[in-house]
Amino acid sequence: DVFDRIGVTYEVYGGPGNCCGILQFRVGDAETAGKIATSTIDRFQNSGAPDVVAWCPTCHIHFSEVALPSVSDEGAPPFDMHMLPTYLADRLDQLKPHLTRSVSKRVALFEFPGARGVTEAVRKLMNAVPGVEYVDLGIEHAGYQMSALETVPDYRSKTIAGVLRAAEENNVDVLCSV
């Protein structure tokens, strides 16, 4: 709906048929991961779109840092990859006329800094919503998503508890995970 409102022409790709190959890559099956990623890249390239927008940080990181550089012999990838928040923040002028309802809330982010520019983009988008007050919880950030912390369960548990405590201490109305 948001893309429709700001006049973006798009096609939706998703599911296992459009996978980045990260699951195979993580367990050491680079050959299968490469085939999956290359097949998906070919589908994206054949669409003719200059931009591919991902909502999944793992897909974005894997395509941008591993798969696309591997298939781009001439250096330039066949399209630009964007995370959804950065794509929308880059089009904030088109989006602002649609942000008309005041949302009187104190909002904090449980953010993961691994996907470049995402946290900044989300803050920029939040600040554009009338009535939203961004609250910085002043906490340490690690990983690129909560599942990245599964190998350090004690740290993960302490992080979650710390975020919830900080949100309560700062009288946050909404705690968003990014």
State the predicted function of each range.
Residues 1-178:
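Iron-sulfur cluster-binding electron-transfer modules in prokaryotic oxidoreductases
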